[in-house]
From Swiss-Prot:
UniProt keyword Cell inner membrane present: no
Primary enzyme class: hydrolase
Assembly, per entry: Homohexamer. Forms an RuvA(8)-RuvB(12)-Holliday junction (HJ) complex. HJ DNA is sandwiched between 2 RuvA tetramers; dsDNA enters through RuvA and exits via RuvB. An RuvB hexamer assembles on each DNA strand where it exits the tetramer. Each RuvB hexamer is contacted by two RuvA subunits (via domain III) on 2 adjacent RuvB subunits; this complex drives branch migration. In the full resolvosome a probable DNA-RuvA(4)-RuvB(12)-RuvC(2) complex forms which resolves the HJ.
Designated gene of the protein: ruvB
Region (Large ATPase domain (RuvB-L)): 4-186
Residues that, per the record, bind ATP: R26, G67, K70, T71, T72, E133, D134, Y135, R176, Y186, R223
GO molecular function: ATP binding; ATP hydrolysis activity; four-way junction DNA binding; four-way junction helicase activity
Organism: Shewanella pealeana (strain ATCC 700345 / ANG-SQ1)
Head domain (RuvB-H) as annotated region, ranges: 260-337
Membrane-crossing residue ranges in chain numbering: none
GO cellular component: cytoplasm; Holliday junction resolvase complex
Protein name in the entry: Holliday junction branch migration complex subunit RuvB
Nucleotide-binding recorded as keyword: yes
Length: 337
């Protein structure tokens, strides 16, 4: 299992991330949202069109690696539409009654946000189909031969589902989302803007180079950038006069064992396992998981995406392969095949 205090783990939310300062860091409207330009442009059109027609926005599926702002986007959609948002997650909705209670309390055009929607149970998913398509809720009354089905009308609403594993959704559920949106890793420029904005909310002095250095080591992920910013702030307040510069950011992040590529101990452990234990690969996912003592799902969902996107690992039909860039990162000469 990945350590709970892994600084760059994007799917762990720190306790202080739900406090007021973190809520203030989140953009409230699309104009405040940084990055994901294509997604933002599409959403503006869809929201304005729905508002002109006086209708609920079409159901929306937001997918991509953890920490890229899926929850934030759902809240922005509700704010832009001027409606309420009710939030839950797939594992929490164990029974059909859990979902029915949420649906029957929605006001017209409200947003229902379901995180980890790929983890919905089949019985809950079945209830969701008519609710999404016809705004109706099918409920069974009674048991056995006396059981009967009744239909309850629901107000028009927008379901926003979020997932890191879009492929794990069943085809019938995936087909019912009219607006699929994929979030990509952020570039350094956009991330540095997010770091600068967050520092302002925290009343922290930071120069452009300091923000860029934190952004460079944040794995393209805003959640990680904000987490690293907090730790750099601690370092700056204790070791220096509180202002974050490039040198201070470098010192702090080096001390935290986050290297220039944004890798920590687990990333390096995975790459070195492929290079040293499996001679650069290919290696199957199960063997790799056993070699580093990690679950295969964690490798697939948390560790691999950024390493693949940055060109350190290749995924082939025969398994994972370390690329020349991975060898170069550790100053290891790649053997000739």
């Amino acid at each position: 299992m990945i350590e709970a205090d892994r600084l760059i783990q994007p799917n762990i939310i720190e306790r202080d991330e739900i406090e007021a300062v973190d809520r203030a860091m989140r953009p409230k409207m699309l104009d405040e949202y940084t990055g994901q330009d294509d997604t933002r442009a599409q959403l503006k059109i869809f929201i304005q069109a729905a508002q002109k027609r006086g209708e609920a926005l079409d159901h929306m599926l937001i997918y991509g690696p953890p920490g890229l702002g899926k929850t934030t986007l759902a809240m922005i959609v509700a704010n832009e539409m001027g409606v309420n948002i009710k939030s839950t997650s797939g594992p929490v909705l164990e029974k059909a009654g859990d979902l029915a209670a949420l649906l029957t309390n929605l006001e017209p055009n409200d947003v229902l946000f379901i995180d980890e929607i790929h983890r919905l149970s089949p019985v809950v998913e079945e209830i969701l189909y008519p609710a999404m398509e016809d705004y109706q809720l099918d409920i069974m009354i009674g048991e056995g031969p006396a059981a009967r089905s009744i239909k309850l009308d629901l107000p028009p609403f927008t379901l926003v589902g979020a997932t890191t594993r879009a492929g794990a959704l069943t085809s019938p559920l995936r087909a019912r989302f009219g607006i699929p949106l994929r979030l990509e890793f952020y570039n350094v420029k956009d991330l540095s803007s997010i770091v600068t904005r967050s520092a302002k909310v925290m009343d922290l002095a930071i120069d452009d180079e300091g923000a860029i250095e934190i952004a460079r080591r944040s794995r393209g992920t805003p959640r990680i950038a904000n987490r690293l910013l907090r730790r750099v702030r601690d370092f700056a307040e204790v070791k220096h006069r509180g202002e974050v510069t490039k040198i201070i950011a470098e010192e702090a992040l080096d001390m935290l064992d986050v290297d220039a590529e944004g890798f920590d101990y687990m990333d390096r452990k995975l790459l070195l396992a492929i290079i040293d234990k499996f001679m650069g690969g290919p290696v199957g996912l199960d063997n790799l998981a056993a070699a580093i003592g990690e679950e295969r799902e964690t490798i697939e969902d948390v560790l691999e995406p950024f390493l693949i996107q940055q060109g350190f690992i290749q995924r082939t039909p025969r398994g994972r392969i370390a690329t020349p860039r991975a060898y170069s990162h550790f100053n290891i000469i790649q053997p000739v095949s």
